[in-house]
A protein has these predicted regions:
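C-terminal and inter-domain tail/linker signature
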Residues: 1-105
């Protein structure tokens, strides 16, 4: 699997996607992911939604803030032979970091 938008310093492929998800889940143990739109055909799946959680763990080197924050996300997957072959994902992490007080407003 090819990840076209890996997190900075993340490994490529499935392992990198899993590690990024584990880091995010550790930073937001009560993470709730809401799907707002899902469109699919035989070759592509596109998803948009919102992630919300309370920052109780380290996030990108920053200590926990205890604040709740949310961010919009968009994911697109290319499917080949019934499996995810490619992934593109975009999250409003800057907006989330501002809500947590980790970036200026």
């Amino acid at each position: 699997m090819v990840d076209h938008t890996p997190a900075p310093g993340a490994k490529q492929g499935r392992r990198g996607v899993v590690e990024a998800a584990e880091m995010f889940r550790a930073a937001f143990p009560d993470l709730k992911i809401t799907i707002e739109s899902l469109v699919a055909d035989e070759e592509r799946v596109s998803v948009t939604g919102k992630m919300t959680g309370t920052n109780r763990g380290t996030l990108m080197g920053a200590p926990p803030t205890g604040k709740t924050a949310s961010c919009a996300y968009m994911d697109m997957y290319a499917i080949a032979n019934g499996q995810i072959a490619e992934v593109w994902h975009v999250e409003d992490l800057a907006g989330m970091m501002r809500q947590l007080g980790l970036l200026p407003s």
